[in-house]
């Protein structure tokens, strides 16, 4: 049960490239794999679940391989990125529009002979 005190079940953890959520089994149960296999889990064991829903029992000695990460939604991150890119694109567009208007004004003055005066 020492492992249960070392982890926060509401906090996601990262191991290498996988985001893992831990839960501590509150009763004897089974975890089921995508290929149809199932394995028993005893009360107090740590069940790890990845983003694809795959589950496995993690040993207490391996918990040091995991680092807690701030929980954020992929969609929130994507929305923030789109907003930032939108601001960048607007700045580029405004600069281009200004340069295009200046070029058009200069061209018009050259054609009409405004610079000859």
UniProtKB/Swiss-Prot annotation:
GO biological process, one term: regulation of DNA-templated transcription
Domain of life: Bacteria
InterPro entries: Arc_rbn_hlx_hlx
Protein name in the entry: SPbeta prophage-derived uncharacterized protein YosL
Organism: Bacillus subtilis (strain 168)
Gene: yosL
């Amino acid at each position: 049960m020492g492992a249960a005190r070392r982890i926060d079940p509401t906090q996601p953890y990262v191991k290498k490239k996988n985001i893992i959520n831990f839960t501590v089994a509150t009763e004897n149960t089974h975890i089921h794999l995508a290929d149809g296999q199932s394995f028993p889990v005893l009360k107090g064991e740590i069940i790890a679940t990845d983003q694809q829903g795959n589950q496995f029992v993690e040993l207490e000695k391996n918990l040091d391989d995991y680092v807690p990460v701030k929980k954020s939604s992929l969609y929130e991150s994507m929305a923030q990125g789109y907003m930032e890119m939108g601001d960048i694109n607007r700045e580029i567009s405004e600069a281009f529009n200004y340069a295009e208007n200046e070029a058009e004004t200069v061209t018009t003055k050259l054609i009409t002979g405004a610079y000859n005066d």
